[in-house]
Regions:
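N-terminal Sec/SRP start-transfer signal
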Residues: 1-31, 195-200, 209, 244-293, ...
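Hydrophobic alpha-helical transmembrane segments of multi-pass inner-membrane transport and secretion
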Residues: 17-45, 54-90, 110-124, 202, ...
Length: 656
């Protein structure tokens, strides 16, 4: 009996290839995306790159999201196949094949289909991963510290995921066969989908989850918190999107149906009825396209923004060839560092230029009614503002100014943030509970251009010009920084030897609190990180976009076969071709552009959150905004091209 069922299963797959080819495309697509995402997360070189571990964790979370999308896409595709084959299974029952044998037949078909589709998907995934790796590394044109490596562990992870999904598919199919009578299966194809229970409750839950995710993305001000909560917000948006496209679309179509004046127009009647007929499957496909589109937009926008901000970040963090910075919290510790730096400079292979020394105190402020409060604030408190306090003598010497301040006065230079936020500030509370009056507001950007930027992020950043910054030094809530910067005219070929000599001198002293930096060496590290980010971002964006295109194509093909018979009946009832074509256009427009519009809404609400995260890398928010707008415009154009191509396939099937 088994041999007979096996033969029947293979014959059935061939006979129903019009149904299984789109299903295979969907399965291959999700397998490729799963493999690429997991293989990138498992890249061993990430462990040695700046920010590599964070990137690997992000990709690991992305793999979970792709698993969810894969589950929904395969369940959606399987539901279409089962609905169109229900009549066939019903005939088997009438002809005497019992339910257990029909279930076994279904299992054999599913095993053969899954083995071929998953196997092909893994092969294509490995090829795509390797080929795109080679092409992108060629385009980057410099060593980013990452090499292609085959990830056997990713093969196992994808196999486990896909096996789990198809086991679930089999049990759902088996339950359907077991619970349905042969006569019910014969009529299954012509039955519309049930609305499901508690539509209103599900819609409210979906709105609640989405609203909370949106609120979270807009209310978080700290970049560090944005990074921590970003993944939770993404997960909530994914769940809410599937719920709302399901329950929300059902509720919306029901409301439209109750509007008799709108519903009983021929064009609206046809398109709304068709959408209602398969509303739940429609929702799954539309939600998947929406999520994949959002992933493309956010991934590419962040990647491009980080790439464009690389040079600016390098120049702001390292304005000179070399720099040394010593951190201390006790004034008695400051005198040990100048002699060490002088010994380091003596190893220069060329001539020293532009030697500068900065003595600053860093303080963080929380917003008060009249300004900012320095008391009880440290760098871990997500401060509203960061103040770099510098002596008035040092500032005047640097810029040729002649400012004067008293013991309890400060001139505030605005570097970053909203000027209006402190235009009326009169007092500041400091460690000695002294009231410091803001004497004047000036532009602080000239100071920021010559001063190495600090590795802290705050929405508002200022330089505070005071008489003696050391009086603000506090072991708990503030620290002093001794900066030494200089350039050299050393030939390029001697720079490596010069840097090695510098490091050798530093290692001879117990100066753990002092760091030494080379702009050339930092550039290598930064470009390696950004290059790897570009590689990962491009690979994921391509994979997600291919996934979205294939889901769209699958929807058009599968729904074209479902709609063909219904439109033939409409023609027989006397409805003219013009009305039918108009209703088809309206239906296709809804199916195509609802996910696109929703993806842009998701991206708009996510913007503040990923802008904050990108600021951790020193990239200005305007760069992120410009990148998002440009990527969004390009995506719309490409999406329209996909719409034109795939909609033709739908029209061709309808006209057969």
């Amino acid at each position: 009996m088994f041999n007979l069922l096996r033969s029947m299963a293979i014959t059935n797959l061939r006979k129903n290839r019009a149904l299984y080819v789109p299903f295979a495309l969907a399965t291959v697509m999700v397998t490729v995306v799963l493999y690429v995402t997991n293989a990138l997360a498992a890249t061993p070189e990430f462990a040695h790159l700046e920010g590599g571990s964070a990137m690997a964790k992000t990709l690991g979370f992305g793999f979970v999201i792709v698993q969810i999308v894969s589950l929904v896409v395969i369940l959606y595709a399987n539901a279409f196949v089962m609905k169109n084959r229900a009549k066939e299974f019903g005939l088997y029952g009438i002809l005497g094949l019992d339910r257990k044998n029909i279930q076994l037949l279904s299992l054999i078909e599913l095993v053969v289909f899954a083995a071929l589709s998953i196997g092909l998907g893994l092969i294509l995934g490995v090829i795509f991963h390797a080929a795109s790796f080679a092409i992108l590394l060629k385009l980057i044109q410099y060593d980013i510290g990452i090499k292609y490596s085959f990830q056997f562990g990713s093969i196992i992870a994808v196999l486990l995921t896909m096996v789990a999904i198809f086991v679930l598919v089999f049990f759902l199919n088996a339950a359907k066969i077991y619970m349905s009578r042969p006569l019910e299966l014969l009529k299954e194809k012509k039955k519309g989908e049930k609305k499901g229970r508690a539509v209103a409750v599900r819609a409210i839950i979906g709105l609640g989850l989405l609203g909370y995710a949106y609120y979270m993305s807009q209310s978080i001000e700290s970049p560090v918190k944005a990074l921590l909560y970003f993944f939770l917000a993404v997960l909530l948006v994914v769940i809410a999107t599937y719920i709302l496209f399901d329950a929300g679309s059902i509720a919306l179509l029901s409301i439209l149906q109750k509007n008799k004046k709108l519903f009983y127009q021929p064009t609206n009647f046809i398109s709304i009825s068709n959408l209602q007929f398969r509303m739940r499957k429609n929702a799954a496909g539309l939600a998947s396209v929406c999520i994949l589109s959002t992933m493309v937009l956010v991934t590419m926008a962040t990647t491009v923004a980080l790439q464009r901000g690389t040079t600016a970040r390098l120049d702001s963090n390292y304005p000179t060839d070399y720099s040394a910075v010593a951190y201390f919290v006790l004034e008695k510790d400051m005198d040990q560092y100048p002699p060490i730096v002088q010994k380091i400079k003596e190893q220069t292979k060329g001539q020293l230029k532009d030697e500068k020394t900065f003595l600053n105190v860093l303080r963080f402020g929380q917003r008060t009614e009249n300004g900012f409060d320095f008391a009880n604030v440290n760098s871990g408190d997500s401060p509203a503002a960061m103040f770099t306090l510098v002596s008035v003598d040092q500032y005047n010497k640097m810029f040729g100014t002649n400012y004067t301040v008293g013991d309890k006065e400060m001139i505030v230079g605005h570097i970053k943030g909203d000027v209006k936020q402190i235009s009326e500030v009169k007092t500041y509370s400091v460690v000695y509970n002294a009231t410091i009056t803001v004497k004047e507001m000036i532009d602080g950007t000239p100071y920021a251009k010559v001063m190495p930027q600090l590795p802290y992020v705050a929405d508002n950043q200022y330089v505070g010009i005071v008489k003696d910054p050391m009086q603000y030094l506090n072991p708990v809530a503030g620290q002093a920084m001794y900066y030494f910067t200089w350039n050299t005219n050393t030939p390029f070929e001697l720079r490596d030897a010069e840097w090695a000599a510098y490091k050798n001198v530093k290692s001879q002293y117990k100066a753990d609190a002092m760091s030494l930096s080379s702009k050339n060496e930092e550039a290598k590290t930064l470009y390696a990180f950004m290059g790897s980010l570009l590689l990962v971002g491009a690979l994921l964006s391509i994979a997600f976009f291919i996934g979205a295109v294939l889901v769209i194509y699958y929807k058009q093909i599968s729904e074209g076969y479902e709609d063909r018979d219904r439109f033939v009946i409409l023609q027989k009832l006397g409805i003219d071709q013009k009305t039918i074509k108009k209703s088809i256009n309206r239906q296709v427009l809804i199916v195509f552009f609802l996910p696109l519009v929703t993806a842009f809404i998701h991206t708009a609400f996510a913007f503040k959150m990923y802008r904050k995260i990108i600021e951790l890398f020193g990239v200005d928010g305007s760069v992120t905004l410009n990148a998002t707008v440009v990527i969004g415009a390009i995506f719309v154009v490409v999406y329209l091209i996909v719409y034109q191509i795939t909609s033709r396939s739908y029209y061709r099937i309808i006209k057969r």
